[in-house]
Regions:
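Short, charged N-terminal beta->alpha structural module
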Residues: 5-28
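Structural motif
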Residues: 6-11, 38-39, 58-59, 188-190
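N-terminal Rossmann-like NAD(P)+-binding domain of SDR-like oxidoreductases, especially those catalyzing
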Residues: 9, 54, 60, 197-199
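Flexible gly/pro-rich beta->alpha loop and the following alpha-helix that scaffold active-site loops
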Residues: 24-87
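Gly/Ala-rich beta-loop-alpha elbow adjacent to hydrolase catalytic centers
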Residues: 87, 91, 96
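Pocket-forming structural segment of enzyme catalytic cores
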Residues: 97-197
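Extracellular ligand-binding/catalytic regions of CAZymes and related secreted enzymes
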Residues: 195-208
Length: 208
């Protein structure tokens, strides 16, 4: 069995911050993986019999190229694929937008605590501290929201510098989502920085 890691970074150096940490997690768990740049994905990779799951990594704040190239991700909706997919930050945005979600500007940088209202992968309902680094959020009714944060305005952005700050339960900004009928998961935060166990669980367990 093999995990396909999809690199969406325009700049090669960003690979070391957003992709390599995920590769390192899988390597330590002795999980076989293949990493490929999103523009180079072909049916050969997607229909590989060894392919079990897919992770779409995030990228830097200044890199929005992937948002202009969503046609490269049409395969996400292929019925014959039917593999669990886990999108991280930009990866979650891609998953939502492919299913015709709405992109909204919402810059969040730093650590906050968010409330998981239901079990999400191996996260039981609880308060979790997560690391955020993004300019945009996504809204999509095809996905169920498992955890969220309040939309930040003006001076409220300063709250992100306080790791003790607890986000609102109003779930205005989805931080953890799952497609209502498909094994497609997304997180706006970066589990490769904090909460590595989420990646280990997705890769190692049987995902419904």
């Amino acid at each position: 069995k093999m995990i396909l890691i999809i690199n969406i970074c325009k700049e090669k150096l960003h690979y070391y911050e957003f992709v390599k940490p995920i590769e390192d997690i899988l390597r330590k768990e002795n999980i076989e993986y293949q990493t490929i740049y999103y523009k180079k994905i072909t049916d050969k990779e997607l229909l590989n019999k060894k392919l079990e799951k897919i992770i779409i990594c995030g990228t830097s704040l200044k890199d929005n190229e992937y948002l202009e190239n969503l046609d490269y991700f049409k395969w996400i909706k292929f019925p014959k694929l039917n593999k669990p997919i886990f999108g991280i930050c930009g990866g979650m945005q891609i998953l939502s937008l492919v299913f015709l979600g709405v992109l909204i500007e919402n810059k969040e940088i730093g650590q906050i605590k968010i409330q998981f209202e239901k079990k999400f992968l191996n996260f039981e309902p609880s308060l979790k501290e997560v690391y955020l680094l993004h300019n945009y959020a996504v809204i999509n009714n095809d996905f169920e929201v498992f955890a969220g944060s309040e939309r930040l305005r003006g001076r409220e952005k300063n709250k992100l510098n306080n790791p003790c700050e607890v986000a609102s339960k109003e779930l205005e900004i989805p931080q953890a989502i799952k497609h209502k009928t498909k094994p497609i998961y997304g997180v706006l935060f970066h589990p490769e920085v904090r909460n590595k166990e989420l990646i280990k669980y997705f890769c190692g367990e049987i995902i419904p």
